[in-house]
UniProtKB/Swiss-Prot annotation:
Species assigned in the record: Fusobacterium nucleatum subsp. nucleatum (strain ATCC 25586 / DSM 15643 / BCRC 10681 / CIP 101130 / JCM 8532 / KCTC 2640 / LMG 13131 / VPI 4355)
Compartments it resides in: Cytoplasm; Cell inner membrane
UniProt gene name: era
PANTHER family listed in its UniProt record: GTPASE ERA (PTHR42698), GTPASE ERA, MITOCHONDRIAL (PTHR42698:SF1)
Keyword GTP-binding listed: yes
Pfam families linked to this entry: KH_2 (PF07650), MMR_HSR1 (PF01926)
Name of the protein described by the UniProt record: GTPase Era
RNA-binding among keywords: yes
Residues reported in the UniProt entry to bind GTP: 10-17, 57-61, 120-123
The family this protein is said to belong to: Belongs to the TRAFAC class TrmE-Era-EngA-EngB-Septin-like GTPase superfamily. Era GTPase family.
Region annotated G4, chain positions: 120-123
Length: 296
């Protein structure tokens, strides 16, 4: 038995969460097309051929604009020192930009661990462009212990990735039970489900300005469990967008979130959603701490 912790890093919105969900074959991390979707280090655990791979989905490393962004970048950078392997993800269909190089600089500053580069969406480029991409990688990002190419939906590349990770796993250890695919609590998963539905249904500044908190859980024998959840935004205008005309948007969010939560729990529930305004909450340390977004 071998096991190891693998930090999955990259610029925001490069596809880290999609990769981990695919690897684990479970929905561990929420996914949207909005940058900054992942706010915490989330573990996805894969047991395969007597090996245990613990993939850590990190927030996209970027230059922070507020305390929440600072927290997200700090925990992503900190994990670089603690893992066994760094898995850097880039998009083959896009030029390597300043965001990718910013991530590479943080890796160089904070870790000497083995580095594997996963180049996603290689099915969107030609063989000639693939050769050019390899040269671009060497020029802008430097050397890696291994470079793996994968298709956009990972129809190929996964087995090659696991094979590349194997030599760096630690012998004789196992960190989690075979039936465990994440270390996230059920309540945390529930709040992430609600946030995902908002991300998928709203636009502009809303996705970055939303926080979710379970404020009450009622369990009575013979009755459905009831979850009351606050949705925090920073402006009255944002509150109006989430509620929608005659409450239509909030109802749609609630219906979709409740359905997925019921699938998670295996039982019917009541779900109450309440939209609250907390001015500039992303800049306020006490509130961020209340939500679990400030390191002790």
């Amino acid at each position: 038995m071998k096991a190891g912790f693998i930090a999955v890093v990259g610029r925001p919105n490069v596809g880290k969460s999609t990769l981990i969900n695919k690897l684990v074959s479970e929905k561990v991390a929420i996914v949207s097309d909005k940058a900054g979707t992942t706010r915490d280090n989330i573990k996805g655990i894969l047991n395969f051929k007597d090996n245990q791979y613990i993939f850590i989905d990190t927030p996209g490393i970027h230059k922070p604009q507020h305390l929440l962004g600072e927290y997200m970048t700090n925990i992503a950078v900190k994990i670089l020192k603690d893992v066994d392997i760094i898995l850097f993800l880039i998009d083959a269909s896009k030029p390597i930009g300043t965001g990718d190089m910013f991530v590479m600089d943080r890796i160089n500053e904070n870790s000497k661990k083995p580095r594997i580069l996963l180049v996603n969406k290689v099915d969107l480029i030609s063989d000639e462009q693939k050769e050019e991409k390899i040269k671009e990688i060497e020029e802008k990002l430097g050397k890696f212990d291994k470079i793996i190419f994968a298709s956009g939906m990972y129809s190929f590349g996964i087995s090659q990735l696991l094979e590349a990770l194997d030599p760096y796993l630690e012998d004789g250890v196992k960190y989690y039970p075979d039936d465990m695919y994440t270390d996230m609590s059920t309540y945390r998963i529930i709040t992430e489900i609600v946030r995902e539905k908002i991300l998928l249904k709203t636009r502009d500044e809303i996705p970055h300005s939303v926080a979710i908190e379970i404020i009450n859980v009622e369990r009575k024998e013979g009755k459905k469990d009831k979850f009351d959840i606050n949705i925090y935004v920073e402006r009255d205008s944002q509150k109006g967008i989430i509620i929608g005309k005659d409450g239509k948007m909030l109802k749609e969010i609630g219906v979709e979130a409740r359905k997925e939560i019921e699938e998670l729990l295996g039982e019917k529930i009541y779900l109450g959603l309440w939209v609250k305004v907390k001015d500039d909450w992303r800049k306020k340390k006490p509130f961020l701490k209340e939500l679990g977004y400030v390191e002790e």
